[in-house]
Amino acid sequence: MTDVFISHAASETNLAYFLKRHLETEGHSAYVAALDVKPGEVWMPAILENLKSSQWVLCLASRNACASPWVMQEMGAAIGSNKKLVPIVWDQSPDELPAWMRQYQAVELGHDEATARAAIGRIADLIKVDKQKGLLILGLLGLGLALFGGK
């Protein structure tokens, strides 16, 4: 299962890779189609499977991405699957996002690497807390089954 699906415009693969690399150093698995679809793989099912298996969808919500039919299709699938969606902006303000996307709290990367790293760190921390909650719930369910199943 992928922790994070990163949606981006084709022209922003380098930024998607930067985000992926930093999330992975924080212990999260991240999927970027431009980097992770293998040669010869049928790409559309691979992308949709990774989107469906992720808990979080980070959209590099640039002007190019907001105009991309592919990115908008991925966002529709994310919303339809109740994913935790985070728009990430840097070349426009959150107020300039499409109306439907403005309802999600955006994260601004800023215009320098230190600010971007700090923003990604905040996102990574949220994902970590979310994963820990999921593990706690699974543990409690397992304990409940063990206690009540043994009677």
Where are the language model's segments positioned?
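C-terminal helix of von Willebrand factor
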Residues: 111-129
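Conserved beta-strand/loop subsegment of P-loop NTPase cores
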Residues: 85-89
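Conserved N-terminal substructure of TIR/SEFIR domains
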Residues: 1-56, 83, 136-151
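Conserved TIR/SEFIR loop-to-helix hotspot centered on a Trp-containing motif
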Residues: 63-83
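Generic recognition of short, well-ordered alpha-helical segments
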Residues: 17-18, 42-45, 69-73, 99-101, ...
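Redox-cofactor binding/interface segments in oxidoreductases and associated redox assembly factors
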Residues: 59
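Glycine-rich, charge-decorated loop segments at or immediately adjacent to ligand/cofactor-binding or catalytic sites
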Residues: 93-104
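Short glycine-/small-residue-rich Rossmann-like dinucleotide-binding loops
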Residues: 10, 62-63
